[in-house]
């Protein structure tokens, strides 16, 4: 059974989720809502993408709706989520990708329009967070609003799970070397809460905060309080990389660590965790659907108990694919797929 989904917010992640859904046989996008974009402009932004190229399909505007590959997608422009008539299209699930309605109470407004469940495509202060391959099996039917966590948490958590399950992480620090995003500036501009964040994105390496490492403690409770991290925003447009430095309880050679990651990537975490010994750089992974691609040749160990691990991720495409995978997973648990 195909899962019918609505998208609220047709920005960066909303559009990339839509593009991924075209490739995902188990998901059908039936409606989109964005109060700041009219349908013709939405069609234009969906068709042309500076990072991922031109949309491979047919896009038309008919009345106020989009027609994608012959299928009608209802297009709404409601500012209040409570006023979006999701029930008109049978959208049982909603992807909340505005970046605005990220708490349980705010996201629950979608239920008034007929949606039954909401997946927030961002970290949430109070909604339960799920990372595919890590803690998705803890989802229960009674949960109405949930979060897919962040792109960085989706990269870090599968790797941390493998290492912790096999060797036990005592403590660790993470740095994500992260491509710039839409919240940053093209030229220097005001940013009262984050002075460095107001500097030109394309010219600077900008230290920044991230809650991604601490969030791992929410999806892997055994690591709660054992990981923290920071971000370096760099002048690349997409694809980021996690640098995880951990102290291990059970000593292991770097080769043993590689073997453990490869076994997980080829086995239970296939499609989520990747493994490569190729001499790759960031652009090689543009459009990669996996959450985390372990770079076997980039890591180093000081000794058997202290190691630095490196794992790549397409912070747009891979994350958006996991949003859909999470939707399909919860639909199966709910009995709707």
Swiss-Prot record:
The active site is at 151 (nucleophile). Its main location: cytoplasm. GO terms for molecular function: glyceraldehyde-3-phosphate dehydrogenase (NAD+) (phosphorylating) activity; NAD binding; NADP binding. NAD(+) binds at residues 12-13, 34, 79, 315. GO terms for cellular component: cytosol. Disulfide bonds: none annotated. InterPro entries: GlycerAld/Erythrose_P_DH, GlycerAld_3-P_DH_AS, GlycerAld_3-P_DH_cat, GlycerAld_3-P_DH_NAD(P)-bd, Glyceraldehyde-3-P_DH_1, NAD(P)-bd_dom_sf. It comes from the Eukaryota. Its EC number is 1.2.1.12. Keywords: Cytoplasm, Glycolysis, NAD, Oxidoreductase. It is found in: Cytoplasm. One of its GO terms (biological process) is glucose metabolic process. D-glyceraldehyde 3-phosphate binds at residues 150-152, 181, 210-211, 233. Pathway: Carbohydrate degradation; glycolysis; pyruvate from D-glyceraldehyde 3-phosphate: step 1/5. Coiled coil: none annotated. CDD domains: GAPDH_I_C, GAPDH_I_N. The record marks 178 as: Activates thiol group during catalysis. SUPFAM superfamilies: Glyceraldehyde-3-phosphate dehydrogenase-like, C-terminal domain, NAD(P)-binding Rossmann-fold domains. PROSITE patterns: GAPDH. It holds the Pfam family Gp_dh_C. Homotetramer. Belongs to the glyceraldehyde-3-phosphate dehydrogenase family. This is Glyceraldehyde-3-phosphate dehydrogenase. It comes from Phaeosphaeria nodorum (strain SN15 / ATCC MYA-4574 / FGSC 10173) (Glume blotch fungus). The gene is GPD1.
């Amino acid at each position: 059974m195909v899962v019918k989904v609505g998208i609220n917010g047709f920005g960066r992640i909303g559009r990339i989720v839509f593009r991924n859904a075209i490739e995902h046989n188990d998901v059908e996008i039936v409606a989109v809502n964005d109060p700041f974009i009219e349908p013709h402009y939405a069609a234009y932004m969906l068709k042309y993408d500076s990072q991922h190229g031109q949309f491979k399909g047919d896009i038309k505007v008919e009345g106020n709706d989009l027609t994608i590959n012959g299928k009608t997608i209802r297009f709404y422009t409601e500012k209040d989520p409570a006023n979006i008539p999701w029930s008109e299209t049978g959208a049982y699930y909603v992807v909340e990708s505005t970046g605005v309605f990220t708490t349980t109470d705010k996201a629950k407004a979608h239920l008034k329009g007929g949606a039954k469940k909401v997946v927030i495509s961002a970290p949430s202060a109070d909604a339960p967070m799920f990372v595919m391959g890590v803690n998705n099996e803890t989802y229960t039917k009674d949960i109405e609003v949930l979060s897919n966590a962040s792109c960085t948490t989706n990269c870090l958590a599968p790797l941390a799970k493998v290492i912790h399950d096999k060797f036990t992480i005592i403590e660790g620090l993470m740095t994500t070397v992260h491509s710039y995003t839409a919240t940053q500036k093209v030229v220097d501009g005001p940013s009262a809460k984050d002075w460095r964040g107001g500097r030109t994105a394309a010219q600077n390496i900008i230290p920044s905060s991230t809650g991604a490492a601490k969030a791992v403690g929410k999806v892997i409770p055994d690591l709660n309080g054992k990981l923290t991290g920071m971000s370096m925003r760099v002048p690349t447009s997409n694809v980021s990389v996690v640098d995880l430095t951990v102290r291990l309880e059970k000593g292991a050679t770097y080769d043993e660590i590689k073997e453990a990651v490869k076994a997980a990537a080829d086995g239970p975490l296939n499609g989520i965790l990747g493994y490569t010994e190729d001499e790759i750089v960031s652009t090689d992974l543009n459009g990669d659907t996996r959450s985390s691609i372990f770079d076997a040749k980039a890591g180093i160990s000081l000794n058997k108990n202290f190691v630095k691990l490196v794992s790549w991720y397409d912070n747009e495409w891979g994350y958006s694919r996991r949003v859909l995978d999470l939707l399909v997973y919860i639909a199966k648990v709910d009995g709707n797929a």
